Amino acid sequence: KKYNEAEKLFSEHLKSQSNHAKTIEYLGDIAGHQKDWDAAITNYKKLKVSYPKNANYWYKYGGALGMKAKESNKFKALGMIDEVEESFLTAAKLDSKHIETRWALVMLYIELPGIIGGSEKKAQKYADELMALSKVDGYLAKGYIDVYFSRYTKAEINYKKAHEIGNSKTTFEKLYDLYLNKLKDKTKANKLKREFENK
């Protein structure tokens, strides 16, 4: 309900200032929250066309397009993948410190079948770039890749390193989930939980 009210306000504001970037971005964000990918795509597209050097607009556009592709049938999704990849790559080029875009590329290259551009090598490249920007993100990304390929022992090493540095809810959840659901090691999972709750 709050989103609907906000959407009305922003839409009204846009009538008087049709090119107000922040307003267009908010409308895109609201649409994204409501999983209205078409509206999100339309708003972010306006922004990336008007501000082609803004990495965040490219990232958000690629993200909304990627979510739409995930919910579309296979043939339709195939036609969208190149543009999703291109948007993320543009964002990464425009901003060498953009963490979210590098995460998006890691996930994209890991989840895509090899025949349409998926590649562990490419995913590792962006995991390395993440490592240079933030050790926690780097280890989490490498752990994510290991989990995807069922290399759970390697994933444990990476997730443990991420947790030692970050000691956050995110690093805890990744390692805990690995122990509990992948390595099926309740003892390790419970020990980790106790340590995290008593820190």
Annotate each PLM feature.
Residues 21-22, 55-56, 99-100, 135-138, ...:
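Helix-start (N-cap) detector for alpha-helical repeat units in TPR-like alpha-solenoids
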Residues 34, 68, 112, 117, ...:
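Structural motif corresponding to the intra-repeat A-B loop/turn of tetratricopeptide repeats
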Residues 3, 37, 81, 120, ...:
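TPR-repeat structural position
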Residues 18, 52, 96, 132-135, ...:
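Short coil turns that delineate tetratricopeptide repeat
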Residues 22, 26-29, 60, 104, ...:
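Canonical tetratricopeptide repeat
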Residues 31, 65, 72, 109, ...:
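Residue at a conserved register position within TPR or TPR-like alpha-solenoid repeats
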